[in-house]
Amino acid sequence: GIQTTKANSLTTGRIYKAVIDKERRGDYLGKTIQVVPHITDEIKRNVKSLGQKYHYDFVITEIGGTIGDIESAPFMEAIRQLKWELGKNAINIHLTYVPYLRAAGELKTKPTQHSVKELQSVGIQPDVLILRTEKHLEEPVLKKVASFCNVDLDCVIQSEDLPSIYEVPINMQNQGLDTAILRKMGEPIGEKPSLGPWRAFLERRNNAKDTVNIGLVGKYDLQDAYKSIRESLSHAGTYNDRKVNITFINSEYLTDDNVAEKLEGQDGILICPGFGQRGIEGKIVAAHYCRTHNIPTFGICLGMQMMVIEFARNVLGYADANSREMDEKTPHNVID
C-alpha cells in the first residue's frame, strides 16, 4: 500500500492559511491577494508537489462538493488550469448521478447532462464519466449520455449499486475504466491485471463460515463517524472467515439499569473514541459491565481512557477518579 500523510489531504482552510502566511512574510511583494491567481496557484502547487516529492506514477485528486457551489469555484479554476498546463498528462473524471424514477420505471439522464454543461461553462471538459445509479444502464442510455456530454462511449462507465464497495473495482475493470484512462493519457496498455489478491479477498468476504457480533459503544449517531472502525472490523472478520454483525449502542443513553439488555448477545464490545463530556459515563458503565461479565473489550482513545477510569473507580477504590480533560480538579487524575 501507499503510506499517506497530511499532504494527501487538502482543505480550503489550509490553502487560505498558506496564502495568508506567505503574504505576511512578504512573498507577494505587497501585491493585492486574489482568488486568481494566488489561491488557485497554491492549490496547483500542492497537487503538483505531491507527485514530485513522493515520485508517484499517478496522482489522483478528488474535488469534493457539487459543481456550481461557490465553495468549489477556486478548485474548479485550478483544475482547469492544471489540465491546460499538463495537457495529456492530466485527465478529468466526472462522477455524476443518474436517478431512477420507480413510479415511472424510467432513468433520467438530464441531471448528468446539466452537470456536464456546468463543468463546461467553467472551461472543464470531462474525459471520463462515472454514472452512479441504482439500476443497470443499457447501452442506449450510455450512448445518449456520451453523445450529449461529448464523451467517448468507452469512457462512459456505470457504477451501479453493489452489495459491497469492494466489488466496485472489479466492476470498473470489467467495463474498461483502466484501459480508457491509460488511452486518454497516452500511456501504453499492457496485459490486463488479474487482481488475484483482491478477488481472493472478495471470495473470503462473501463466503464467511461463521458470524461474530460486535457492539460499538459511542455517542455519534452519524454512521460515517466510525467508518474506519467499521471497515477495520469487517477486514478483520474477513481474514478470520467471519461475517461481522455490528450493532451501534449509544453511550449517552446507557445506564446500569439497561446495560445488560443493550449489550445482550454481543461477542465483543468496542468502546469508541470521541471528545467532550457527553456520553462518557455510559462508556464507563459499558466498560464495567464487560469487565465483570468477561466480555472481550477493546477501547480506542477516549474509549481506552474510560476503561482505565472504570478500573480505577471500581477496582482501586478511587470513586472520584477521572481524566484531567473531564475534571481538572479531580484528586485522582488517572489520565493526564
Q: Where do the language-model regions lie?
A:
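Flexible phosphate-sensing "switch/lid" loops adjacent to ATP/NTP-binding sites
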Residues: G1-N245, S251-G268, F275-G276, G282-Y289, ...
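Cysteine-nucleophile active-site neighborhood
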Residues: K262, G268-D336
